Amino acid sequence: VRTTGAGGGGPVTWAGVTLARAAGAYDIVSLAVPPGPAWESARPGQFLVLPGDPARGEVLPTLLWVAEVSVDPVHGTAVDVVVPAGGGWATGQRVRLIGPLGRGFGLPAEPVPSLLVGQGGSVVPLRWLVAVLRSKGCEVHLVLAADDPEAHLDLSPLRRQASSVVLTTPGDLLGVVAQVLDQQPGLGVVFAAGPRAAVREVAAVSQSRGRASRVCALDLDETLLCGTGLCGQCDMSVVDPRGARTTRPCLEGPVVPGEWLVDAAR
């Protein structure tokens, strides 16, 4: 692995695929990357950009959530990403990447019961967040939505770590979230990731019930995203202490206070 130069969001790093394991509809791929303080401080909600390579017919960049980071003084630094099953990631393959990018989920200063809400492939950062919150003494509950029951990612470890896991469909997601919040008044904060419209609605449901929320305002499943702030494709309207404005989640987020999205929709 080595760093080769500057990219739109930071240095372009060569990383090596060390392991790819099947996880239902996905493959979890481990990458060996050069050690550094950015990886040591990485947190759930950050992402990577794999630059396009026109010579290989890859015009657009690929954006991937950081699924987990392991820093070991002996074995080095490993970064996990999640890709569709059979995506062609082979052990020994070398890939270029930029990252970790963005602002991830902030952690509560004290242990607090937390609800994590995810839809589709955006559950990837929440998978890591569950483990981090549990290590901080937080009780964790999950609501996960997918169009196909087979599309849920790696449920077994989530069920071992979380106090409860509720599976639903995108159409029923908001109703289930509202029900969980009503039934468990001790839940203090909601973390959400998914399509922008979905996380905005989750934030609104949370706010209406007096819960703080932190949401991923960047949906990596959107097309034509650059991830480095150049394209403007992810621009969104928000209302924050500075007033109404347009923000670029790949730079200011992707994790933002849920009320930013709720107030902008009014």
Where are the model-predicted features located?
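Short glycine/proline-enriched turns and hinge-like loops at secondary-structure junctions
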Residues: 42, 58-60, 108-110, 228-229, ...
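Local cysteine-cluster metal-coordination motifs and their immediate loop/turn environment
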Residues: 221-255
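Hydrophobic beta-strand signal
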Residues: 49, 95-98, 235
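FNR/FR-type flavoprotein reductase catalytic core
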Residues: 87-225
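A short, sequence-level motif marking secondary-structure junctions
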Residues: 66-70, 251-256, 263
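Ferredoxin-reductase
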Residues: 2-93, 147
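A charged, well-structured terminal subsegment
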Residues: 246, 258-266
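Short, charged beta-turn/beta-strand-edge "cap" motif at the junction between a beta-strand
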Residues: 53-57, 98-105, 240
